[in-house]
């Protein structure tokens, strides 16, 4: 008879992988360390594969463990979503929604939508992850994020996810007040200055980099920031230049008094998409939240 993986073994395996140790996982699961170790051992024996490297300071996943983790974590998230879906369809409007979004979306679109949704469903917990799409791919794959609203450009993900265009945002070049570049009217006049940008692996910045390369107008980026807030702070308090969403650079709360440089070149707009796994089935409350984001995008674009 073929070995049948049990759900408690999946939970044990995923928690050990996340905590990096039997001790940490046993605390999270409220299990004894011997019972947890036995569960992992039985799982490895049943699969005929070593899932962890055991070391004095903890455990790390083997190649087989990495592969199994992708499936196991998705199984747990799908099970959670299925249970919440049934409860919500029975009128128990509670649970958790996990969403990701780009920094510009979190500072413009998100506050109105989330505050309204929370007033309607105060018992629902919403977890928000901010960043570029590249930083969220694994969470989307594993079901740890229900959806994200982010930029996307010619990536290898078309077969995994659906992409629904929601809105576009204009980008511009910014500097601090009093910067010697003020008065420049073209990107070529700015190429000798120091630049900082969010990670070039991000979808929009990859598109922008390719466009400027074609036009021989690529600035030398000396500092790469993983967050927009770090990028904005560096521009505000130094001589670095950067390309940012117009609304973020012009907002006194987030832009810290930045100055937009009126260059003659028009930067391409960034398209933002609702991105979901192709095989995902959203719970009623998650579908309702998505609808509210769609409506807010329509309002902002009108």
Swiss-Prot record:
GO biological process: regulation of DNA-templated transcription
DNA-binding region: 22-41
Stretches assigned to the HTH lysR-type domain: 5-62
Keyword Transcription: yes
Gene3D superfamilies: 3.40.190.290, Winged helix-like DNA-binding domain superfamily/Winged helix DNA-binding domain
InterPro entries documented for this protein: HTH-type_LysR_regulators (IPR050950), LysR_subst-bd (IPR005119), TdcA/AbgR_PBP2 (IPR047993), Tscrpt_reg_HTH_LysR (IPR000847), WH-like_DNA-bd_sf (IPR036388), WH_DNA-bd_sf (IPR036390)
Keyword DNA-binding listed: yes
Keywords: DNA-binding, Transcription, Transcription regulation
Disulfide bridges in this chain: none
A Pfam family of this chain: LysR_substrate
GO MF term set: DNA-binding transcription factor activity; transcription cis-regulatory region binding
Changes seen on gene knockout: Cells lacking this gene may lead to an altered expression of abgT.
Highest rank taxon of the organism: Bacteria
Family classification: Belongs to the LysR transcriptional regulatory family.
Job of this protein: Could be the regulator of the abg operon.
NCBIfam families: PRK09791.1 (NF007307)
Protein name in the entry: HTH-type transcriptional regulator AbgR
The organism's taxonomic lineage, starting at the top: Bacteria, Pseudomonadati, Pseudomonadota, Gammaproteobacteria, Enterobacterales
